[in-house]
Amino acid sequence: ETDAIVHLAGKAQDTKNESEAAEYFAVNTGLTQKIFDYFLETSAQKFIFFSSVKAAAESVPGEYLTEDAAPAPKGPYGESKIKAEEYLLSKLSQAEKLQKKVYIVRPCMIHGPGNKGNLNLLYQVVSKGIPWPLGAFDNRRSFCSIDNIAFAVEQLIVRDDIPSGIYQVCDDEALSTNELIGLITESSGKKTLIWK
């Protein structure tokens, strides 16, 4: 017997822009619809879908993006994730009639062991001692540690007082790229080289 379904499968954002848009929609939207429809037929009481902050926005005008912000995804990755969310929300009343809960988790960039993507590229640049040429920009970005995302999912599973809905998950504080580089160099014993 299954208590919860945690849906993590999906097509990740392609940093090389080699993927066809249809691939994102087939996997991120179509597969989600199939898994959710299966969930409605099972004894599982909770469905946790890993969407992405990219379903809500490509960039954040203020310091934080809230769940109340009107979604404005850009590109097939974010657009396919928001379409999956819309499908789940369109079936929410059906799930609730069955006493089931539906959680849409929108994590920002997750960091931890084995990280891939842009954060790993930044780590490689910094750990090689290459100076960061964009130090004059004061950008801030939210991250989420793998430990924090695991804790959030655990709470969604074990607690019954959390209502169905959309939850954007991140660490407590946003970091600038310069602060992030400082943390990387400190942890790797390298000297921080930032051009301003």
Region locations from a protein language model:
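Conserved sequence/active-site signature of Rossmann-fold short-chain dehydrogenase/reductase
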Residues: A55, I110-G112, I149
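NAD(P)H-binding glycine-rich loop region in Rossmannoid oxidoreductase-like domains
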Residues: E1-T29, K34, Y38-E41, A55
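Substrate-positioning beta->alpha
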Residues: N115-L121, G135-V158, S164-G165
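Mid/C-terminal beta-alpha module of Rossmann-like enzyme folds, strongest
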Residues: R159-K196
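Catalytic helix-loop patch of NAD(P)-dependent Rossmann-fold dehydrogenases
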Residues: A26, G30, V60-H111, N115, ...
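Conserved Rossmann-fold NAD(P)-dependent oxidoreductase catalytic core, especially the SDR/UDP-sugar
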Residues: Q33-P76
